[in-house]
Design a protein with these regions (language model features):
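Serine-hydrolase catalytic machinery in alpha/beta-hydrolase-like enzymes
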Residues: 1-102
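Gly/Ala-rich beta-loop-alpha elbow adjacent to hydrolase catalytic centers
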Residues: 107-116
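Acidic catalytic loop of the alpha/beta-hydrolase fold
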Residues: 171-174, 196-202, 228-230
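Catalytic histidine neighborhood in serine/cysteine hydrolases
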Residues: 213-232
């Protein structure tokens, strides 16, 4: 479970308790992991932080340099479309995959939804070759932290994920650095939830991720909820859609009872 920008694992856990309970009821063996991103987000990185925090001036006058408990998987470099801190996040996620996995799937919100799509992409067969090709044209290098030439999964540290879910997520855009995440299209089944009243993430940015996924606009893979920038974790219709998606993926791809939802591995 990958939290959004300026959140933390414990905060995201608290906000999605209802969703966790529903998933545990549907999948009794499920256990959700809530890592906190490695990049500390400072006050200066948060738009209008001082205006929205009345205690900010008091902290300054007392000489207290309190920073918010805010973290991110990356942050923008000025107003550009280049992200800083991404390498640290991939190294951190790789350690979680190795120490806590293997995982069946990954779920993320907002920036975490964007990261979830990237992680699903990175673990796909032949994605490394796409990065090698893109690197020659200004693309970023495939993360070395995801490589294991002695491993059992085609030189990677973890097998391909069975599914990914993005709530209010987005794609990194058309910058050459990030092209290989999305070209060729992400083959992992991805479910995208978008809020019709979301004013934080532009719809076109979210649809970039949708269209970068194979079957991204297939029925049941793109779902709008009548709200804003949040996870509809207590609304039965949308929780049911998530559970149905996961069941279809796990049961639909199983060849034996051992692979069924009752024996589902720990999702990320």
């Amino acid at each position: 479970m990958l939290h959004g920008y300026t959140q933390s694992g414990p905060l995201f856990h608290a906000k999605t308790k209802a969703l966790e309970k529903s998933l545990q009821k549907a999948f009794p063996q499920v256990k959700l992991h809530y890592p906190t991103a490695p990049n500390r987000i400072r006050k200066a990185d948060i738009p209008n932080f001082g205006n929205s925090n009345p205690s900010n001036d008091e902290s300054k006058s007392n000489g207290v340099e309190d920073e918010p408990d805010a973290w991110g998987w990356w942050r923008r470099r000025d107003d550009s479309s280049v992200y800083l801190g991404m390498d640290d996040s991939f190294m951190f996620i790789a350690e979680v995959l190795k120490s806590e996995g293997p995982f069946d799937g990954i779920i993320g919100f907002s920036q975490g939804g964007a990261a979830a799509g990237m992680v699903a992409s990175l673990l796909e067969p032949r994605r490394r070759e796409a990065f090698d090709t893109a690197e020659a044209n200004g693309g970023r290098k495939y993360p070395e932290s995801f490589l294991d030439d002695q491993g059992s999964w085609g030189g990677l540290i973890h097998p391909p994920l069975k599914f990914a879910v993005s709530y209010s997520g987005y794609g990194a855009g058309t910058h050459p650095l990030y092209k290989a995440f999305y070209e060729p299209k992400i083959q992992t089944p991805v479910l995208n939830f978008l809020g019709s009243l979301d004013i934080i993430v532009e719809e076109k940015r979210s649809l970039f991720l949708v269209d970068a996924c194979t079957d991204g606009r297939k029925e049941g893979r793109l779902i709008y909820h009548p709200g804003g920038h949040f996870v509809p974790s207590s609304q039965g219709q949308y929780v049911g859609a998530l559970i149905g998606f996961i069941k279809d993926i796990i049961d639909g791809g199983s060849s034996s009872k051992e692979d069924s939802v009752e024996n589902m591995n720990v999702p990320f």
